[in-house]
Every structure is written in C-alpha cells, then in structure tokens.
Amino acid sequence: MLELRLVQGSLLKKVLESIKDLVNDANFDFSSSGFSLQSMDSSHVALVALLLKSEGFEHYRCDRNTSMGMNLGNMSKMLKCAGNDDIITIKGDDGSDTVTFMFESPTQDKIADFEMKLMDIDSEHLGIPEAEYHAIVKMPSAEFARICKDLASIGDTVVISVTKEGVKFSTRGDIGTANIVLRQNTTVDKPEDATVIEMNEPVSMTFALRYMNSFTKATPLSNTVTISMSPDLPVVVEYKIAEMGYVRFYLAPKMEEDEPEPGA
C-alpha cells in the first residue's frame, strides 16, 4: 500500500514540468524515507536525479519498497488538472497496474481523482559516484536562466570558466561572441541573491546550451542554483526543493574534438 499526501500540490506540478521534456518514461522508486527518480534523457547525454523526502509530505505511507513506471508526459497532463492550491494525494496498491492521483481543493468542496496506467520500464540504476568538485558556484536561479537564454540566441555552446575573480559564461556563433561575468557577491540583503564561489582550482568547461536551457525549467523550484564542476566529470546543476529534497541534472562536457575547426 502506498499513500502520499502533499499539501503544496503545486510543488509536484513544478517538479514534473522541470523534467518531462528531458525524460519520457521513468521508474519512480518509493521507500519509507521518500521517493526518487533517476533517468538518462533519450539521447543519453544528460542524467536527471530527483529526491523528495517523506518528511515533506503531510501523510506518507509506503509499506514496502516499490517501483512504478510512469510516462512523464501523461503524468504531467493529469497533474495539470490540479489547481495550484490543491492538495495532491498519490495512491497505489501492491500489484496494481495503475496509480491514482487525487486532487482536493483547499476548502475540500471539490475532489477529483485520476487513474493512470503504469508501465513496465527496464532501467538500470546508475551509481552516481560522490565526487570532490574543483569549483562550486551558487547563484540566483533566475539569473542563471537568463544567462542561458541570452547566450542561446548567439551560439549553441557555453564555456563556463571559474576563477577566483568570478564565473564567466561565454559563447560564440555566426553573428559574434558574448561573455557574461559574475563576480562573487555576498553583500546582499537576501541570501538567495548572492553569488558564492568555492574554488580549489580554476575550471573551464564547454556544454551544450540546449541542455542548460532545459535544466532551467526547474527555476520555479528554487531561488538558487548550484553548479558543481571538475575537469572530466559531468557538471551537476542542482535545484534544492525547500525542506524536501532536490532535482539534479548531470551533463557531460563537450570535448575539444566535438568542436568544429575555426573557419571550417
């Protein structure tokens, strides 16, 4: 028996919106401590890892560890039927091939339930090794989204360079080049407006902007984003979900040989 009740139902809607364009079908793994999802995108370039801890739910019951395969597009369609203030309950029975989403209005004068068919999905659980990162940048998530959007109008890739002076986002395209530098800035009224850089060694890596822009769909989940980088490791773009968990996106860097020759 599985039953989870989330008072802030809009949170689940935002989580789905942030990952559904990257991942089509995925297994949600439920345990007594919370539920998680880990899946590669369809082109096997990016990895999504989601965790929502049980203590963030008003009611959380999971009698035994269970995995439910869901189509995220279909799940998103169902969650869109919930009002932003609705309380969302997820129910599942052992051995059932469906999951039920129940939406209650805050005044409880309207209750809707939607039943969705589950899928059998073969997916290997990829061990994500813990790593020490050379550079970790914490910055306002809206600023990161704006930078990725602006640079994508110029080029296809972004070079993220971290030095003790700051973090630089650069791109080049047919019409020219663009460089945006953020200096460390901790003297702000609100902590979420700060740009904080922890750096052991300078790092400079290149990534596809198409993916970075997709990751920024998680911006509504958190005021801040944390970008962790080390040479030869995928970048980690993390959005913390208040008191509950996180959505993390892992993206392999583009290697030098991926780049076209200048003038080619």
From Swiss-Prot:
Major localization listed first in the record, in broad terms: nucleus
Keyword annotations: DNA replication, DNA-binding, Nucleus
CDD domains linked to this entry: PCNA
Gene Ontology molecular-function annotations: DNA binding; DNA polymerase processivity factor activity
DNA-binding region, residue intervals: 61-80
Domain of life where this protein originates: Eukaryota
One annotated Gene Ontology cellular component of this protein: PCNA complex
Transmembrane residue ranges: none
Keyword check for Ribosomal protein: no
Cellular compartment(s): Nucleus
GO terms classed as biological process: leading strand elongation; mismatch repair; regulation of DNA replication; translesion synthesis
Pfam families reported in the protein's UniProt record: PCNA_C, PCNA_N
Family the entry assigns: Belongs to the PCNA family.
Function description: This protein is an auxiliary protein of DNA polymerase delta and is involved in the control of eukaryotic DNA replication by increasing the polymerase's processibility during elongation of the leading strand.
The name this protein goes by in its record: Proliferating cell nuclear antigen
Organism of derivation: Populus nigra (Lombardy poplar)
Lineage: Eukaryota, Viridiplantae, Streptophyta, Embryophyta, Tracheophyta
